[in-house]
């Protein structure tokens, strides 16, 4: 037995006290939770301990049965009698030091309490053991090696002298749907726990886990009891933060949690186990600075926020699991497993186990993480892990946990029914046909649609009938019976899968060599309860193979046992049932053999004996059906790629030994007829009963079957439309499942609604799929930001001012082509264009051309331009406004149509220039643009019906009224032509919108939009982050 941890320091502090004339040396040990004293005759008031416990030291394990009360530091505290103490007479633990308010000052070798200072004495030694309540059993062969490992890795264990560190490689964040603060009123603190709360807050502040807060967020707190007792026998307590409102706004972190069954199943050949529990696990993860305010809580008049990851957050377990997975990634599955803050180390022999412990502890030290000493269990041949007892023999239920089920009172409300089923379901792997047994109790939770309702009020009273009471008692009795030990799987050996199906449920037992590995079961859904017996039996096999895929994938041999002999025909090649054919194909993928085992039930106690089993043989295929060519079939009944489920009248045909007809109504408007026929005459007679001449009738069967009676079908139903469907897909009736399927398909590649519908129809069907797909696409934030808007929303065109004479309103811009720049101007009245070459876009280079334009049009009142920096410079705006009295109107950024007059001219100008270049009149860019401008001004404009150069001529003033009338008419025609497809939008202050990004910035993978908040609605534009954005640039 090894029962010591080494401090690794040479001087240990102690104090001396007198007891009835005897001097006691009392060790100050902040790592010990309780106080201990050696039994001496001077002790008085010795009394028995209410709950005896074991203490281990270097001298062996000792059971603590007695205690006494002693006054130390002016504080009365219990001391437990321990006769294995040698170097010291007593040990003073942390409980007494904390309660008495003792402050240690090791630098000055003193301590202080209640204003009294006392000198410390020191005991010099190379190393001293301390008492621990864990009984550590270590084989003699590795005792020294294990001791050296613990000394070398002692930093992995938390001590009260050290503030709890944190992992520097991980930063936790709290992503919420918005930044609106969550505030909840504080709960009143009970007076009886006020001191505990204050001490807890002080300790958290001291350790740097929390800090004072001024956050607008607030979550309330309360105190709950937790396992164990303190030195006085009182229940331990825990301070809990109620983060429920914050959790409602938190975006889920979809990090996959480990599968508990798979962890337990993979502990196969291990003989030794060690379990580690990380000290205040979540508090060892650093919380991002910008999210700390969200964790604010108030207690006893103070307000604080967490600097580390707190307990109770929605994503806390996912964040911590990811962190531990990163720390132990190279070891997980090989020497250890991790489930949140519970680590189990497993090995096949003693020396490997010491080495594995050393490896894991080193990884934790490297990650700056600490393990709780009190909860560590070393070198166990049987240990509790995740609510199960694991050992070299297998897995069994934890008696302590099962005891809670055995003593559970009969539920009297929905809440207690849910609680009992949840508790019992945790151990369903130990109960064969759990779903069938629990079915009467589960039915209590079903709503009107036959499905278990999550929204049923938990306060609804419940009174068990006799059937439900029997099911309740049976579950308790099974768990109270002798433990069933689940065997670890050996993946080199064959697996035996025993399945069974009843009218209400299906179940399976996976085993090897007669010993169960796991047991699974579930109740049948409403449509599945209508399956034929052979379909239910086959469903049990298919479901079990899928559910146990982690065990069976890649297995060399799988033997399937069933008690239903007619399954022989169900798995035969000649069976034409499409569903059964799909299931058989799935079974064939698993290299499985199906065997028939006589008997009404397959119990685990039967040891799944394989003696006297008859392998199922396929029956010889009949040649009765006449096979016609697919070509002839095409001329009679058209084959469609649509699944059968899409049609209002659905007929599924299959040849069988016995005639059978079943009618189903799906989605209130669709009829499905399942017909098993033996001969053609009976089939035609039955078809007359189910065929609907008013709609298209869909038929699903294989081509040879349809070919055998297609001519009779046409002859008997000459005016009826038929379609042959190749596929039948799964009907989805649950609305939430429909949304989940469409959303999952859309999120796969974010394609359009029609593509999503086609993809979903390959496997599923439900009505109104199109509208749901369009809704999902329309509400997809990713699509909004990443996709081009093929049908952008545009504001209605409004009436803009119409000039009355030439030069009253002009539009200017800078046109660039072939690395040449031109200042362009177009008169809104005459459409006359002016183009001036410029060297650059700077103020210096555009000022002179602007003055030339003003010289040509001396009566300019308004200049329209875009957001070119030079146009908006102080120099240019001051010159136009102050010197010439000209108003400047700027178009909203990234909305060229607001300056459409000149933008449209640029298109025409480039078009004329390209034509001139092809005519080889010149290759000089400047000359081409200037010549194109001349030709433009000489061409009749489509709106004014005049040549611009003639309208500018002084002699054209008499035609001004006529030209203005044409401008007004053109504007009205444009409004009438465009506005029917446009709609004005109004935005509220604070409304979130998507703003189109500048295409010239970023690359092809840059998001096309960013989400922003509206500050003000300006009519045709909105104000966002202090800048004007035209509504056409919003999605």
Curated annotation (Swiss-Prot):
An annotated GO cellular component: DNA polymerase complex
Gene3D superfamilies xref list: 1.10.340.70, 3.30.70.270, Acid Proteases (2.40.70.10), HIV Type 1 Reverse Transcriptase, subunit A, domain 1 (3.10.10.10), Ribonuclease H-like superfamily/Ribonuclease H (3.30.420.10)
EC number: 2.7.7.49
Family annotation (InterPro entries): DNA/RNA_pol_sf (IPR043502), Integrase_cat-core (IPR001584), Integrase_H2C2 (IPR041588), Peptidase_aspartic_dom_sf (IPR021109), Retrovirus_Pol_polyprotein (IPR050951), Rev_trsase/Diguanyl_cyclase (IPR043128), RNaseH-like_sf (IPR012337), RNaseH_sf (IPR036397)
Integrase catalytic domain span: 797-956
Pfam entry (one): RVT_1
Any GO BP: DNA integration
Keyword Nucleotidyltransferase: yes
Reverse transcriptase domain segment(s): 205-390
Keywords: Endonuclease, Hydrolase, Nuclease, Nucleotidyltransferase, RNA-directed DNA polymerase, Transferase, Transposable element
Gene Ontology MF terms in the entry: endonuclease activity; nucleic acid binding; RNA-directed DNA polymerase activity
Coiled coil (residue ranges): none
Reactions that this protein is recorded to catalyse: DNA(n) + a 2'-deoxyribonucleoside 5'-triphosphate = DNA(n+1) + diphosphate
CDD domains: RNase_HI_RT_Ty3 (cd09274), RT_LTR (cd01647)
PROSITE patterns: INTEGRASE, RT_POL
Source species, domain of life: Eukaryota
PANTHER family for the chain: PROTEIN CBG26694, PROTEIN NYNRIN-LIKE
Protein name: Retrovirus-related Pol polyprotein from transposon gypsy
Biological source species: Drosophila melanogaster
Gene symbol of the encoding locus: pol
């Amino acid at each position: 037995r090894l029962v010591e941890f080494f401090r690794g320091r040479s001087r240990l502090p102690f104090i001396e006290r007198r007891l009835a004339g005897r001097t006691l040396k009392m060790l100050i040990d902040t790592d010990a939770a309780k106080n201990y004293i050696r039994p001496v005759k001077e002790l008085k008031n010795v009394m028995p301990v209410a709950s005896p416990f074991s203490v281990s030291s270097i001298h062996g394990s000792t059971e603590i049965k007695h205690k006494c009360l002693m006054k130390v530091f002016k504080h009365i505290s219990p001391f437990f009698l321990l006769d294995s103490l040698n170097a010291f007479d007593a040990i003073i633990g942390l409980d007494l030091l904390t309660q008495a308010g003792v402050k240690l000052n090791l630098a000055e070798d003193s301590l202080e309490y209640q204003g009294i200072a006392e000198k410390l004495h020191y005991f010099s030694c190379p190393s001293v053991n301390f008492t621990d309540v864990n009984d550590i059993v270590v084989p003699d062969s590795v005792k020294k090696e294990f001791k050296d490992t613990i000394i070398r890795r002692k930093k992995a264990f938390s001590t009260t002298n050290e503030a709890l560190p944190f992992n520097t490689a991980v930063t936790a964040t709290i992503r919420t749907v918005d930044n609106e603060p969550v505030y909840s009123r504080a709960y009143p603190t009970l007076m009886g726990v006020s001191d505990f709360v204050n001490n807890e807050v002080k300790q958290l502040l001291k350790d740097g886990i929390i800090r004072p807060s001024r956050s607008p967020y607030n979550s309330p707190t309360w105190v709950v009891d937790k396992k164990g007792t303190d030195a006085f026998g009182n229940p331990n307590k825990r301070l809990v933060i109620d983060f429920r409102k914050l959790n409602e706004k938190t975006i889920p972190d979809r990090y996959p949690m480990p599968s508990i069954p798979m962890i337990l199943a993979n502990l196969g050949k291990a003989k030794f186990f060690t379990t580690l529990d990380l000290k205040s696990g979540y508090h060892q993860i650093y919380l991002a600075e910008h999210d700390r305010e969200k964790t604010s809580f108030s207690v006893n008049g103070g307000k604080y926020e967490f600097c580390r990851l707190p307990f109770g957050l929605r994503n806390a377990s996912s964040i911590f699991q990811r962190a531990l997975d990163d720390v132990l990634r190279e070891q997980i599955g090989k020497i250890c497993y991790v489930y949140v803050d519970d680590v189990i180390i497993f090995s096949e022999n003693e020396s490997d186990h010491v080495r594995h412990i050393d490896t894991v502890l080193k990884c934790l030290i490297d990650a700056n993480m600490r393990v709780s000493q009190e909860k560590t269990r070393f070198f166990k041949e049987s240990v509790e892990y995740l609510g199960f007892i694991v050992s070299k023999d297998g897995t069994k239920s934890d008696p302590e946990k099962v005891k809670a089920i055995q003593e559970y009172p009969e539920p009297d409300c929905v809440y207690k029914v849910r609680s009992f089923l949840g508790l019992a379901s945790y151990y369903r792997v130990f109960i064969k046909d759990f779903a069938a047994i629990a079915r009467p109790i589960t039915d209590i939770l079903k709503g009107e649609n036959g499905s278990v309702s999550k929204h049923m009020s938990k306060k609804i009273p419940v009174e068990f009938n006799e059937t439900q009471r029997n099911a309740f008692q049976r579950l308790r009795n099974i768990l109270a019976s002798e433990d069933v030990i689940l065997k670890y799987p050996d993946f080199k050996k064959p697996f035996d899968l025993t399945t069974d199906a009843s009218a209400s449920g299906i179940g399976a037992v996976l085993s090897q060599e007669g010993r169960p590995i796991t047991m699974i079961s579930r109740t049948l859904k409403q449509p599945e309860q209508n399956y034929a017996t052979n379909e239910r039996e086959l469903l049990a096999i298919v479901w079990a193979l899928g559910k146990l895929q982690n065990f069976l994938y890649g297995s060399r041999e799988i033997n399937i046992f069933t008690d239903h002999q007619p399954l022989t025909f169900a798995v035969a090649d000649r069976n034409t049932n499409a569903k059964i054919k799909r299931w058989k194909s799935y079974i064939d993928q698993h290299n499985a053999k199906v065997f028939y085992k006589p008997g009404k039930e397959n119990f685990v106690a039967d040891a799944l004996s394989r003696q006297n089993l008859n392998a199922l043989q396929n029956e010889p295929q009949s040649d009765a059906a006449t096979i016609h060519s697919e070509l002839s079939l095409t001329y009679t009944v058209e084959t469609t790629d649509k699944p059968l489920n899409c049609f209002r009248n659905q007929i599924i045909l299959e040849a069988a030994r016995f005639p059978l007809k079943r009618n189903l109504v799906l989605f209130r408007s669709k009829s499905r007829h399942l017909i098993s026929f033996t001969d053609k005459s009976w089939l035609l007679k039955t078809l007359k009963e189910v065929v609907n001449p008013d709609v298209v009738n869909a038929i699903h069967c294989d081509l040879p079957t349809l070919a055998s009676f297609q001519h009779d079908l046409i002859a008997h139903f000459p005016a009826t439309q038929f379609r042959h469907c190749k596929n039948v897909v799964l009907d989805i009736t649950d609305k939430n499942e429909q949304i989940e399927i469409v959303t999952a398909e859309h999120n796969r590649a974010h394609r359009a609604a029609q593509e999503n519908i086609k993809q979903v129809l390959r496997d599923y069907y439900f009505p109104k799929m199109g509208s749901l797909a369009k809704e999902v696409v329309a509400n997809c934030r990713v699509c909004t930001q990443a996709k081009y808007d093929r049908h952008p929303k545009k504001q209605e065109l409004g009436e803009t001012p119409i000039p009355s004479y030439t030069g009253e309103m002009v539009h200017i811009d800078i046109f660039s082509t072939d690395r040449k720049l031109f200042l362009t101007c177009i008169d809104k009245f005459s459409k006359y264009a002016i183009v001036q070459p410029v060297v650059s876009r700077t103020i210096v280079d555009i000022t002179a051309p602007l003055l030339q334009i003003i010289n040509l049009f001396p009566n300019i009142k308004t200049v329209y331009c875009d957001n070119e920096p030079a146009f908006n410079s102080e120099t240019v705006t001051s010159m136009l406004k102050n010197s010439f009295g000209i108003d400047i109107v700027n178009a909203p950024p990234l909305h060229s149509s607001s300056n459409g007059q000149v933008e449209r001219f640029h298109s025409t100008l480039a078009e004329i220039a390209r034509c001139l270049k092809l005519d080889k009149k010149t290759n000089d860019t400047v000359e081409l643009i200037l010549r194109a401008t001349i030709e433009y001004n000489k061409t009749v404009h489509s709106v004014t019906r005049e040549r611009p150069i003639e309208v500018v001529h002084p002699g054209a003033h008499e035609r001004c009224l006529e030209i203005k009338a044409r401008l007004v008419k053109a504007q009205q025609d444009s409004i009438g032509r465009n506005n029917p497809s446009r709609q004005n939008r109004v935005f509220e202050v604070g409304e979130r919108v998507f703003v189109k990004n500048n295409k010239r910035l970023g690359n092809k993978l840059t998001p096309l939009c960013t989400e922003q908040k509206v500050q003000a609605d300006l009519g045709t534009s909105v104000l966002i982050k202090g800048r004007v954005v035209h509504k056409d640039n919003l999605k």
